[in-house]
Each structure stands twice: as structure tokens, then as C-alpha cells.
A protein has these predicted regions:
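Compositionally biased alpha-helical segments
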Residues: 1-110, 114-117, 125-137, 141, ...
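Proline-rich intrinsically disordered, low-complexity coils
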Residues: 2, 114, 141, 178-181, ...
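Alpha-helical linker/edge segments of TPR/alpha-solenoid repeat scaffolds
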Residues: 43-46, 91-106, 131-143, 170-180, ...
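Primarily a tetratricopeptide repeat
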Residues: 65-66, 107, 145, 180-183, ...
Length: 273
């Protein structure tokens, strides 16, 4: 059992040394070579905990501000593995992603130093940011190729796979491939149903947007309830899929928010209605 465990207040760190005080009120500063240290455990700062509570409560704007403050406060030790400056910076980027602020994400990533991240899922998330950046730049063919490679890997969490499918859906939509886009957006639901509330909501609205604007759907809406209605047509199938999504929005996907007005009319095309 180790006997040389020390509880200290770390002030700064470099690639070779750590500067610390024995207590927060101590005047004397000491220095120790990192080569002599086996491992470091950080206590969670109160400010980080408060920001995380906002994050879990889906107040991403408030959480982003909180994480930014933690990142700045502890940046003198961001060389150390597992430090809270690096971790706060990661969640600051995540807040920008959940707010769909892709330009803000790009700016934060440009200055981010991820080397001290220790959690494998966080490291994997960094790889997915390349897909989000392709969305930002509307690099659709590259994004299709990128997500092909990503989806072939097994390392992703459900939330991460949902992101990959969502970005892929946007790429297919950008390439005017509506059915492929719908399949990809449906993958978002399958990968992480309602847990990634921002993505599932956005994917649902994307599906409704695509279906409503599809020429086959427009024809099915025109023929609905007439003798020329064709329940076996692609348009009729898409129309009923949209109706089901509208119902699902009210039950779970909407998170308590009303269905946008432009999609309310779809509900009148419910079969047997």
C-alpha cells in the first residue's frame, strides 16, 4: 500500500514539474518533478458541479458559460491528465453542439487542447466533431464518406451513433436524396431514442420537412379521401409516416413543446380519420 499520498493545492503545471501548496492558505510554494508522481486525483470543483447541473437540466447556454469559467480558472494545470480545465473545455464544446452553434464549436475546437482528456468516450466524441464541421461547411460528399467509415466502427455510444446518423441525414438532404436522408434521420431515433433530446427533436423536424416537401407526398395529400387515393403508393406511405411522427412528437419527441404550426395540417391525413 502506498504511504506517500499527499493532498495539496495545485497552482500550476508544466511538462516537467508541478507547483503546489500544502493548503489553500499556505504562503510557501513547493515544486515536484512530474516524473516522481505516479498519479493525480482531482476533487470536483464546485463551479464545475454547478455547470454540470445546468447541463443535465438542459440549460446549455448557462452551462456553457459555467464551463468556460472553469476552463479559464484552472487553465494553469491543463497539462495534467484528468484536469478540470480540459474537461470543462470539452463540455463547453458539447454545449455549443447541443445549441447547434456550429461556428461557435469550430472556434472552441480551434483553441482546444484535448491531450489531457482521460475518458475514452470523450476522446471518441472528438472524432465526431469532424462530421459536425463537415455539416458546418456543407461538405456533403465528404460527410457521406466519413460517416460510412464511422458507422462501420463499434466503439460509439448510442448518443454518438445518433450524431453520426443525424449528420449523415443532413448530407443526404443537402445532396437532394430525400429517402436516404429519411433513413439516416430514422437511424438517429433508433440509436438513442429521446436520450439525445436535441438530436431526436431535430431529426423529427427534418423528417417532417422532407416528407411534406416531397412531390409524392403532395400528390398523396391531394388525393387523400378521394376515389383516386392509393394506399400502396410511396406518397401515402410517407404521409402516414409523417402523421405517426406528429403523434410521437406529442407523446415524447417534442419534450412538451407544441408541434410547429407548419406541420399541424398533416394530422388531418390520418388514415381512418
Amino acid at each position: 500500500m502506498p504511504t506517500d499520498i499527499k493532498q495539496v493545492w495545485i497552482l500550476a503545471a508544466s511538462a516537467t514539474n508541478i507547483e503546489y501548496k500544502d493548503t489553500i492558505n499556505s504562503i510557501d510554494r513547493e515544486r515536484m518533478a512530474r516524473a516522481l508522481i505516479d498519479s493525480i486525483y482531482f476533487y470536483e470543483p464546485k463551479a464545475f458541479k454547478e455547470a454540470m447541473e445546468l447541463y443535465k437540466g438542459r440549460d446549455y447556454t448557462g452551462a456553457k458559460e459555467g464551463f468556460a469559467k472553469v476552463r479559464e480558472e484552472f487553465k494553469k494545470i491543463d497539462d495534467l491528465p484528468g484536469n478540470f480545465s480540459t474537461l470543462a473545455g470539452f463540455y463547453e464544446i458539447e454545449c455549443a453542439r447541443k445549441l447547434m452553434d456550429l461556428e461557435g464549436m469550430a472556434a472552441l475546437l480551434e483553441m482546444y487542447r484535448p491531450a489531457a482528456l482521460v475518458r475514452e468516450t470523450n476522446k471518441n466524441q472528438l472524432e465526431i466533431y469532424s462530421a459536425w464541421d463537415a455539416v458546418r461547411t456543407k461538405s456533403w460528399p465528404r460527410l457521406i464518406s466519413m460517416t460510412d467509415e464511422m458507422l462501420a466502427q463499434k466503439k460509439w455510444t448510442g448518443t454518438q451513433r445518433a450524431q453520426i446518423y443525424y449528420c449523415r441525414g443532413l448530407a443526404h438532404e443537402g445532396l437532394e436524396e430525400p429517402i436516404k436522408a429519411l433513413n439516416a434521420f430514422n437511424g438517429t431515433f433508433t440509436a438513442d431514442y429521446t436520450a439525445s433530446e436535441v438530436l431526436t427533436k431535430a431529426a423529427a423536424l427534418a423528417c417532417l420537412r422532407i416528407i411534406k416537401n416531397h412531390e409524392e407526398t403532395k400528390l398523396a395529400m391531394k388525393l387523400f379521401g378521394t376515389e383516386d387515393e392509393d394506399p400502396n403508393s410511396t406518397g401515402y406511405f410517407l404521409l402516414q409516416e409523417a402523421v405517426a411522427l406528429c403523434d410521437l412528437w406529442k407523446v415524447a419527441l417534442g419534450g412538451g413543446q407544441p408541434l410547429p404550426a407548419e406541420y399541424q395540417e398533416l394530422l388531418k391525413f390520418k388514415k381512418n380519420n
